[in-house]
Amino acid sequence: MAGKTLYDKLWEMHEVKRRDDGSSLIYIDRHILHEVTSPQAFEGLRLANRKPWRIDANIATPDHNVPTTKGERQGGLEAIADEVSRIQVQTLDENCDDFGILEFKMNDVRQGIVHVIGPEQGATLPGMTVVCGDSHTSTHGAFGALAHGIGTSEVEHVLATQCLVAKKMKNMQVRVEGKLPFGVTAKDIVLAVIGKIGTAGGNGHALEFAGSAIRDLSMEGRMTICNMAIEAGARVGMVAVDEKTIAYVEGRPYAPKGADWDKAVKLWQDLVSDDDAVFDTIVELKAEDIKPQVSWGTSPEMVLAVDQNVPDPAVEADPVKKDSITRALKYMGLQANQAITDIRLDRVFIGSCTNSRIEDLRAAAEVAKGRKVAANVKQALVVPGSGLVKQQAEAEGLDKIFIEAGFEWREPGCSMCLAMNPDKLGSGEHCASTSNRNFEGRQGAGGRTHLVSPAMAAAAAVTGHFIDVRELIQA
């Protein structure tokens, strides 16, 4: 009998009942809530006269709509200019108060992006099932957890029953072997993976990232990779538990303590795929072949190494691909065969649930130190992923480095990742962004998004165009 994958093990641990139609009832250990996808779910509970099944399994924070300037934050709810945004944040506060759910409110130092605060607080643990009304919940899979996004109706279902109906996915292993070259990061790995398999490559699969290059990554790097499993077409991304996982979790506020900790660690050590586990699909990359990546088009799969040129639709034989390239070039305001390094930037955004943790900010600060934001860059934002990340960065003096270089140092939130708060692109503006999606209008109507790592974003900010960051930093 073949061994089990990590996904197989997590599924079996949480399968309450197998149904006749092939789906299963799955128990949910952790439910994370934010202001955008939860209001209707709470209203559904009220209308049905229900209460949350397990209050302590839920944790909440506002992130999508919150303003990130200090002045607006200090003004509290009334300072949120957009009425819908203000109502959503206020409604989350009221719902959590009414139902007794732990919430880190807008000006709590523990507030932040949902996928930053869960791991940071130890609310995300190995072996858990974790859900949230947000597609990038796959981030939490970095801890050897089964984590995925859910819709608003499912948010209500989890609140009411602590279970979900789901169908088991296929298994895909993405193996990245070897040592990453200097200056190449987790963000570059996952962009290279998406460039290789496409945004539909992981459809119907749970992705397990493995190999020596993945094991060498920090937990923060692993979170970046799992975060963008969704852009590879998968609902789930995960990394097996090892000593780095356990070291990261130990001592965090909601992690087990004492004898419970010892017991948990013993259980977590089995959260790896067996040596003889069978995967439906295996994708392999050599770490040494990966260079700093830059997305050029309107899909995350439209990505190239920084030393390449954007494609020419005239030489594309596939009519569908040809049309896609032509449309993307037009929207992005680029010319066929244009060098990536010739793309000039109007704005730079360092933040999001993909890249707003302390290691991300350190990497960007290393590039920014002693330099100035280029004259053609109208705005360069640095938005920490949580109040605690911000606090730590300030203790290390990173805020001063950014401010002296001409960056804006902001309060935590989703910010310019998506156009749901005051931080937006103007039409036609090019932005080097450490976020996860570059769809048309994602950062603002007509905005042109280029996905990069934090170091590459900082390099673009200080030079005004894309450049291989390795030209600016020392090995």
UniProtKB/Swiss-Prot annotation:
It is an enzyme of class 4 (lyase). GO terms for biological process: L-leucine biosynthetic process. Keywords: 4Fe-4S, Amino-acid biosynthesis, Branched-chain amino acid biosynthesis, Iron, Iron-sulfur, Leucine biosynthesis, Lyase, Metal-binding. It catalyses: (2R,3S)-3-isopropylmalate = (2S)-2-isopropylmalate. Pfam families: Aconitase (PF00330). Its cofactor is [4Fe-4S] cluster. Its EC number is 4.2.1.33. [4Fe-4S] cluster binds at C353, C414, C417. Pathway: Amino-acid biosynthesis; L-leucine biosynthesis; L-leucine from 3-methyl-2-oxobutanoate: step 2/4. Binds 1 [4Fe-4S] cluster per subunit. InterPro entries: 3-IsopropMal_deHydase_lsu, Acnase/IPM_dHydase_lsu_aba_1/3, Acoase/IPM_deHydtase_lsu_aba, Aconitase_4Fe-4S_BS, Aconitase_4Fe-4S_dom, IPM_dehydratase_rel_enz, IPMI_cat. GO terms for molecular function: 3-isopropylmalate dehydratase activity; 4 iron, 4 sulfur cluster binding; metal ion binding. Belongs to the aconitase/IPM isomerase family. LeuC type 1 subfamily. Heterodimer of LeuC and LeuD. Catalyzes the isomerization between 2-isopropylmalate and 3-isopropylmalate, via the formation of 2-isopropylmaleate. This is 3-isopropylmalate dehydratase large subunit.
